[in-house]
Amino acid sequence: MTKKRVLIANRGEIALRIIRSVKELDMEAIAVYSDVDADSLHVKRADEAYYLGGSLPSESYRNIKTLMKAITDTKADMVHPGYGFLAENADFAKAVQKKGVIWIGPNPETIKSMGDKIESRKLISKAGLKHVPGQLKPSRTKREAT
């Protein structure tokens, strides 16, 4: 039986923590990296490292097209986004799932709902959870907003 392969769509300490967990679960960790991270510890500790190119995050860690190619090229079974970069991007989560790859994180609908303050407040209120008081609809005037 072949080991499951997890592509970690992040860098640095975040990626290192995920790599450690992936290996404890007896799976293969795939790091991704840009020009500036070529010698980073997360690249060295992973079972495999995939070069994304570029030095800016927009060219690498935030580039959905580039990350989707990495998923295909490495034959990853799962994707862990870490946090930041594309971890809260519903479109990235959808693209990963559409490809038939397991997304390790909230489903795209949850990501979208929790990214909208009013929608997330409505969901929390509906669930009966305690939260900071606030509006359940957008302000229409300056007076309503203050």
Give names to the regions the model predicted:
Residues M1-T146:
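N-terminal beta-alpha lobe that positions the nucleotide/phosphoryl donor
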